[in-house]
Regions:
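Extracellular glycan-modifying ectodomains
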Residues: 1-231, 236-306
Length: 306
């Protein structure tokens, strides 16, 4: 039989997920798409409590804020630009924007408190990185999660290096290890990293590849470094792993029919396929029957007869 694709043969997951886990998902909208499906199918998941985050430093900033439970204040409130008069913050996606600053603060701090409690108890953290490009607010000297349509003159566009990417991710791991050592109520955490298959074509095909390659190399440094610290050949005790979502779309699916109309975002069919591949990789075999039952139950409850 002719072989018509190059399948991505991912190794068996060393950091799996289970229905008994509490999971935090942070990062790009791909993380959000998969996270919503996991929640629909019965997993205990908190998804992007600051909204979609694209770069590694913004993910680190969100983790630090959850650990400190550092609430947002009026100083953090920014009026969105380009004629949008709503309020948000440079730490949030615009999905958090509200008409009044006080309403934004109320909702943002409520989400923060709920997320901080979930993060304290969760034992699995799944981080999906979208791009190594970021924007630094010049006056505040702060890498923002979202520019909020503010004037371009307020920012400097930067591309994180491999070292800066790996340092941000390693800092997340180190902070969690340190907190677990000093706080018995803080659950030790294992991490799954992945790179979003969403293509950022603002800088063209070559620029997108450079950005994604930076993320891949940064993740590889962290995962391989943590694996080297674990001397267990069977993978027991490993604290980080990598799921090849980007490679599956680029090398296995490899066709525009698996993309949405913008030719950059994966189609809903592709998201479903990646979720199936992820759970086949991460979920223990004995829980697949429960997964199928939960999928059937969800589809039945959301079925609308014609």
């Amino acid at each position: 039989m002719l072989r018509l694709q190059t399948p991505v043969t991912d190794e068996r997951c060393k950091v799996g997920i289970s229905y008994s886990d509490k999971i935090m998902m942070l990062g790009s909208c791909f993380s959000e798409n998969i996270g919503v499906q996991l929640k629909n199918f019965g997993f205990d998941v908190c998804i992007n409590p600051f909204g979609v985050l694209y770069n590694p430093v913004s993910v680190l900033n969100s983790v630090e804020r959850m650990l400190d439970i550092r609430q947002f204040s009026l100083e953090d409130c920014i009026r969105i630009g380009a004629g949008d008069t709503r309020f948000c913050s440079f730490s949030h996606h615009t999905s958090f924007a509200r008409e009044e600053a006080e309403t934004f603060l109320l909702d943002a701090n409520m989400a923060l408190e709920e997320a901080a409690e979930h993060f304290r108890k969760c034992n699995k953290v799944i981080i999906t990185l979208g791009t190594s490009w970021c924007f630094r607010h010049l006056e505040r000297d702060f890498i923002v999660s979202n520019c909020l349509k503010r004037p371009a003159a307020e920012f400097r566009r930067e591309r994180l290096t491999v070292q800066e990417t790996s340092a941000a991710l390693q800092r997340i791991v180190d902070l969690c290890v340190a907190r677990a050592a000093e706080d018995p109520g803080f659950a030790p955490k294992q991490f799954i990293f992945t790179v979003s298959p969403i293509r950022h074509f603002k800088d063209g095909a070559h620029g997108n590849q450079i950005s994604k390659s930076t993320l891949l190399l940064g993740i590889e440094e962290v995962v391989s470094g943590l694996s080297a610290l674990c001397n267990c050949p069977d993978g027991q005790g490993v604290t980080a792993d990598y799921f090849p979502a980007y490679e599956i779309v680029m090398d296995e699916l490899r066709d525009y029919r698996f993309y949405a109309e913008d030719m950059c975002h994966p189609s809903s069919q592709t998201v479903d396929y990646l979720r199936e591949r992820f759970l086949a990789w991460a979920l223990p075999p004995e829980e697949h029957q429960l997964l199928e039952e939960n999928i059937r139950r969800f589809k039945h409850s959301h079925h609308r007869p014609h």
